[in-house]
């Protein structure tokens, strides 16, 4: 296992260990007791540093999307009900990530949910915090380093400006990792959504499969990607 793979595995285990804390809006990190600067002074300091910088490295994470209305991942919010309501009503989970961990009875239901999840982020408009950030970066040399997989940054910037270090919802990969190739997920997701209609299942023939080994695909993401196959797989005992 490479150093990077080891780091990813440890990060995922730590995230899983503290999932309930994060889901409730808390943190497992011991926060500093040092009093922050008054808010206006923080803004002034931020502006000064942006103006003086020759190049800016932007670290963008899930808070940007959540602040712009993409707050459906962890709890039963209005946006979760808007996009995932039929699944929440039928299966009882609350929060989009809980749906990713749900043990659906069939692969058809499983992929109905995965398609809905990916369709939600693939087709979301550019959220306001990203537009605010873009205004801040005007005229500056910059690069984006993001853990987000929801395609918001690549909707507003050229791909060479963005490093998506945890994957991208526009692509699939082989669930068995038979090779490193990735495939388009946008059209397959659109086809599954159209076929599913108001239901929660997709037909067998639309379940995406690796053209090399025939295994099911899963989204090209770090973390819950493996759980889509191994955790959500129906119980066989």
List PLM regions with ranges.
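Conserved catalytic core of sirtuin-type NAD+-dependent deacylases
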Residues: 2-236
């Amino acid at each position: 296992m490479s150093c990077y793979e080891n780091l990813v595995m440890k990060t995922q285990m730590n995230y899983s260990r503290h999932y309930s804390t994060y889901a409730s809006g808390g943190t497992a990190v011991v926060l500093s007791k040092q009093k922050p600067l008054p808010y206006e002074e923080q803004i002034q300091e931020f502006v000064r540093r942006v103006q003086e910088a020759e190049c800016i490295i932007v670290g963008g994470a899930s808070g940007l999307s959540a602040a712009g209305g993409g707050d459906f991942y962890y709890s039963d919010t209005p946006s979760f009900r808007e996009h995932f309501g039929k699944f929440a009503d039928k299966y009882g989970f609350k929060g989009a990530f809980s749906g990713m961990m749900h043990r659906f009875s069939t692969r058809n239901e499983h992929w109905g949910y995965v398609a809905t999840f990916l369709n939600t982020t693939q087709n979301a408009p550019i959220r306001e915090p990203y537009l605010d950030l873009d205004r801040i970066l005007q005229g500056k040399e910059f690069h984006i380093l993001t853990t987000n997989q929801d395609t918001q940054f690549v909707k507003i910037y050229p791909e060479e400006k963005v490093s998506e270090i945890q994957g991208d919802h526009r692509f699939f990969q082989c669930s068995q990792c038979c090779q490193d190739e990735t495939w388009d997920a946008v059209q397959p997701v659109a086809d599954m959504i159209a076929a599913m209609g108001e239901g929660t299942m997709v037909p067998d023939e639309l379940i995406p499969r690796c053209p090399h080994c025939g295994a099911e695909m899963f989204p090209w993401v770090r973390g819950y990607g493996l759980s889509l196959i191994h955790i959500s797989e129906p119980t066989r005992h």
